[in-house]
Amino acid sequence: MYGFSVYLNEAIDRDHIDRMVAAGFTGIFTSIHIPEDDSTAYLDRMQDLGTIAKAYDLSLVVDISGTSLHKIGGSFEDIRPVIDLGVTGLRIDYGIGFDMVARLSREIHIALNASTLTEQDLEQLHYYQADLNQITAWHNYYPRPETGLDMDTFKRHNRWLKSTGLRTMAFVPGDDKMRGPIHAGLPTVEAHRSMHPLAGTLDLITNGNIDDIYIGDPTISREVLFQFKEYIEKNRICLRMESARDAVAERVEWILGDHTNRQDAAALVIRSQESRRQLRSNDPIKAVNTDARQFGAITVDNEGYGRYQGEVQICKVDLPQDEKVNVVGQVVQTDKSLIPYIGPGQTFRLLQK
């Protein structure tokens, strides 16, 4: 599942939710115990958010503390008013005993703090007869720089969580409007704090033993949202590129669009398996812009490479100048972190920035 965050310190932006749903996101996270927020508007805004969530059949998970449910008209003794709002899950961190967690799990989905969950905690849940099919493991996000989790420790712990049958979830930061008061991104893993949100997502999926990913910050840019949409709906990674200064325009236009990395993936470059077949002209490709190739360089083999003429490649590492290879463009800096996730058989699209 892919989800996003909507915070109750501002009026609910229906247009933003519409865009996220259109891109394939199916879950909403919100919180009712953020110290900086004015909680007097929580109930009205939660009603608005719940109505939208129900209309789109979205999951809606609310982060709560031991004393916050009354802010949205509910209580631990009677959770039904919260469910009626459209809330499908409660994210519980501290201050609530496992006996209560177990009872709640028989009525509503419960997300527990993945980072601190232990074997003894699971034994307590079993003891109190929790519905473990209703319980998942959600990591926190970390607003302060330098406090996010270490990736190695994180993935080891997630491996254990998944071995118990629990589904895992983590946050990646946005790249547009950052949540205050620190405005430094809301990642789970520290290494993702300044990373492209989709690259952080792919890292969690590929390396982090994570099932569900949510955007922690309130928004992502339109360009990044499009990249998420392409990946969620078509399993395609989109890379934005800038043309080399002296690149021949028709050659740049020719390489834009969809490609597939060869199944026998190369170590140093991404090789488009379609590119030589798609060469539109029998005219030889002359040597031009045969510069040194930096990480993220987009290249076309010229006539000097014989039958390889027309092959489009993206450099995964810095490579030296080669008279037989034309540099036609460069993946933009922010998208370079997506390159390592274009593995064997992965489709990708080149877009002009």
Predicted regions located by residue number:
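Glycine-rich, proline-tolerant flexible connector loops at the mouths of alpha/beta enzymes
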Residues: T26-L49
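Active-site mouth loops of central-metabolism enzymes
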Residues: M1-D15, V62-G73, T116, H183-M195
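C-terminal functional modules
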Residues: R245-K353
